């Protein structure tokens, strides 16, 4: 498994693009996905979630995820990357928790979320307080509408997955075999 670490934690970044296969990646941003055409598969930890047009999903900071596209035809989505510091009242919870099921189906997506996603894709270079307000609206719905679980519950107990996750989370540090073995609960 090829893992990518992306530095996406400064302000806001938005992309409206064709969906493609994306290998497992990890970044410090809150990632929001809103499917505008077709379908996409969102993989979070060991789970794969099917998304269709109008579905909304969120991936919290430092959670390994990937994308796959199986549908033929036009598949497009809005991808928003928000710096966690934009939402100080949610910052601590964003570090500890993750949605158990990261998708809200089209028929249940609150209009506030849709309006905020559409506003954010057009507001990248304007007033940061307005950007912050839209981010707060989205997270307020996420934390009230989605069941949260401890981030440690996302993923797998598989030793390979755990090793990749450890390296991804500690790649900026010098990695020692004995420290990694201790963290993974295996002998050196």
Predicted regions mapped to residue ranges:
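Aromatic-acidic/polar surface patches that form glycan- and anion
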Residues: 25, 69, 128-131
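Generic protein-terminus/edge-of-domain signal
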Residues: 1-56, 71
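A hydrophobic/aromatic-rich effector-binding and dimerization subdomain
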Residues: 1-16, 59-126, 140-148
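Short, Lys/Arg-enriched, Trp-marked, Pro/Gly-tolerant hinge/linker segments that flank
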Residues: 98-108, 122-135, 140-184
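Short coil turns linking two alpha-helices in DNA-binding domains
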Residues: 187-188
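Glycine-centered loop/turn positions within well-structured domains
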Residues: 40, 65, 173
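Hydrophobic packing within well-folded, soluble alpha/beta domains
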Residues: 51-54, 59, 167, 180
